Amino acid sequence: MKNISENQVKASEEKKHTPEQAADERPFTAAVITLSDKGAKGQRVDESGPAAVQMLEEAGYEVREAFILPDEPELLEKELIRLADELKVDLVLTSGGTGFSLRDRTPEATMAIADRNAPGIAEYIRMCSARITDRAMLSRGVSVIRKGTLIINLPGSPKAVRESLGFILHGLDHGLRILRGSASECAAK
């Protein structure tokens, strides 16, 4: 066993931060999109989006935008591209549009703009949700990557949004750092 001297400890504490460390230390940025025809028309109060924003902010994320869109795939595709390519947020959460209704097209719009699939996140949400309700198997939500942005579809109800984020939020940091280019060791903890 090697003994570390007090001087070595002080020297290591005085090391300058590398750009990689600086990227790790700045807060993750996020955007939240609620998909709801009634919400977009002002006929229903959105509780899901604010629930997601609150949880993200409590976890230290900087939420850049939160808004409601009607269940129109083309509008969602346009906004996902803008948030990933122009605003360059680390994380986009969508809420709603993941069920079996004919208007539920969030997964299709999300896949249409994806560079890569990240299925484990959506699978994990369904697995954990299945412990609460057997209806979890009816969720069609997906998780994908576009450039440096992770995009995750969440269910539409405020309760399901809180539960889903509760399952995954603690585990996203490492993946988001990798997307930023500031984490290289998948096995490192």
Which residue stretches match the model-derived regions?
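Non-catalytic beta/alpha edge segments that cap or flank active sites
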Residues: M1-K189
